[in-house]
UniProtKB/Swiss-Prot annotation:
A molecular-function term among this protein's GO annotations: cysteine-type endopeptidase inhibitor activity
UniProt key word Signal: yes
Domain Cystatin: 31-109
Cell location: Secreted
Protein family (similarity comment): Belongs to the cystatin family.
Main location: secreted
Protein's name according to its UniProt entry: Cystatin Pr17a
Record-annotated membrane-spanning stretches: none
Length: 114
């Protein structure tokens, strides 16, 4: 085997091993859901759009958990505490929606409060 082939094989194996180690350490993978900061201003805006489209009659008190995934747009899964409008009663809610900014469209796939 020529020296060039041996070096190429070595570099290829080193790249495969490095990639494997990075994936094992929890690095973000393309297309996988990623945790996002519940205080993110863009998250709050997009969640408000999703809630208003449902006529849910709730006001967000606190976002407790949120993920975002690149699909045909951004898929959000958001868990939050909400207050029923006009009362002090609070509920725990969860919604899944897809935001397609270039179409100016937000599609709610699931919305529930308990």
């Amino acid at each position: 085997m020529s020296c060039l082939k041996i070096i190429t094989l070595f570099l290829f194996l080193a790249a495969v091993i490095a990639s494997s180690i990075a994936n094992q350490k929890g690095k973000h993978r393309v297309g996988a859901p990623e945790q996002i900061n519940p205080n993110d201003a863009n998250l709050k805006i997009s969640l408000a759009k999703a809630i208003s489209s449902q006529n849910a009659g709730v006001v967000v008190v606190k976002i407790t958990k949120a993920t975002r995934q690149v699909v045909a747009g951004f898929k959000y899964v958001v868990e939050f505490v909400a207050k029923v409008a006009g009362t002090n009663k609070q509920k725990v809610c969860r919604t899944v929606y897809i935001e397609q900014a270039w179409l100016k469209k937000t599609s709610v796939k699931n919305f529930s409060c308990k």
